[in-house]
Amino acid sequence: MYKILKTDGRAKRAEFTTVHGTVQTPVFMNVGTVAAIKGAVATTDLQQIGTQIELSNTYHLHVRPGDKIIKQLGGLHKFMNWDKPILTDSGGFQVFSLAGLRKIKEEGVTFQSHIDGHKIFMGPEESMQIQSNLGSTIAMAFDECAPAKADRKYIQNSVDRTYRWLERCKKEMARLNSLPDTVNPDQMLFGIDQGGVFNDIRIDHAKRISELDLDGYAVGGLAVGETHEEMYDVLDNVVPYLPQDKPTYLMGVGTPANILESVDRGIDFFDCVYPSRNGRHGHVYTKFGKINLFNAKYETDTAPIEEGCGCPCCQNYSRAYVRHLLKAKEMLGMRLCVLHNLYYYNHLMTDIRAAIEEGRYAGFKEEALYQMKTYDKQ
C-alpha cells in the first residue's frame, strides 16, 4: 500500500507498505547486484547505516548461483540474511547491455551468458519465474531498454513489444503467486515506462501501462547516454501521466544532484551503483561535493571524510588513514569508502524527506546543489 503523507510542489513524502516492511520515500535502494554490495559490505552493515531496501539482479543471480538453488534455500531474504524489502530488476537491462549475440523475438530474447557463453533464453514468463524463485518483495517487469539515441521507428516497435511483455508478466506473476510452494505469495510487480527521449511515445506508453493497475511504476531507459536536461524533460512530461496513488521509480539514477532534481519531479524510488563503484576507487561523497582521496593533499589530513557524518568510517578514521589503505590496496580502505558513500546517500534521503515534510524542499534543494559545487571550485 502506498500512502502520500505530504507534498511540497511535485515532491512527495510517502510510505510504501510491503510484506517485508514499510519503506519511507523518497528512498535510495542500495544495489547488491549478486546479493551483496560490492566492497565487502554485509547485510549487517546495511542495517547499521540505515538502508531501507536493497536491490539485486535477476540476470546475475539466475546465472550464479541459480534461482532454483536460492529457492531451495528459502528465498533471497534468507539466503542473504536480510529481513527488509528487496527489489529485483527483471534482467532486461543486463540482457540488452551486457550479454553477447542476443536475438530478440516476440517470445523473448536468446543471448549468451557473460560468464561462460552458454545460450540462455529469457522472456516475460521466464523473468517472472526467476524472480518468483528469488521471492523478492518487488519484481520488475521484463522490458527492452533500448539505446537512448535509437531512431523513432525502433523505439516505437520496442515500446509496443515491451507493453505486450508487461501484459504477459502480469498474468504470469498472478499465476506464480497462487502456487502453494511460492516463496513470496505477496510479491509485487512494477511496470516500466520506456520510449527513449520521445515524450509522445513515453506518454502514450505511460497511459497504457497505468491501466493495468500494477503495484508501482518505473521510468526506465534513462541515464543511458542522454543529457541530464533530456532526462529531466522526460520526467517533467511523463511522470504526471503515471498513477499518483502508486510509487514511481527512476531506474539507475543517479548522482546526488540527479536525485535532488528528480525528487522535485515526483520520483519516490532510486537506485544506482555510483556510491559503491566510486567508493571502491577512493571517490567519496560529502555535502560539499565528491572528493578523491588519492589526491596528495589528503596525505596528512586528520579530519574525517566529512565532519559530523555518523558512518563507521567517519566516526573512527581520518582521510589520511583511509588514503593510506587505498594506496596500499588494502580491502579495508575500499570497504570504508563504500560504507561512507552508502551512508551519505541514505542520509541524503533522510534530509530530503524532512525537507518535504516541513514544506521547504525548494530551498533545501537549491542550497544542497550550491554546496555540492564547493569542491569543484577548489
UniProtKB/Swiss-Prot annotation:
Residues holding Zn(2+): C309, C311, C314, H340
Name assigned to this protein: Queuine tRNA-ribosyltransferase
Entry annotated with the keyword Nucleotide-binding: no
Catalytic reaction(s) noted: 7-aminomethyl-7-carbaguanine + guanosine(34) in tRNA = 7-aminomethyl-7-carbaguanosine(34) in tRNA + guanine
Keywords per UniProt: Glycosyltransferase, Metal-binding, Queuosine biosynthesis, Transferase, tRNA processing, Zinc
Quaternary structure (record): Homodimer. Within each dimer, one monomer is responsible for RNA recognition and catalysis, while the other monomer binds to the replacement base PreQ1.
Coiled coil: none
Cofactor note: Binds 1 zinc ion per subunit.
Cofactor (UniProt): Zn(2+)
Native organism taxonomy: Bacteria, Bacillati, Bacillota, Clostridia, Lachnospirales
Catalytic residues of the enzyme: D89 (proton acceptor), D271 (nucleophile)
GO molecular function, one term: metal ion binding
Residue ranges of the region described as RNA binding: 252-258
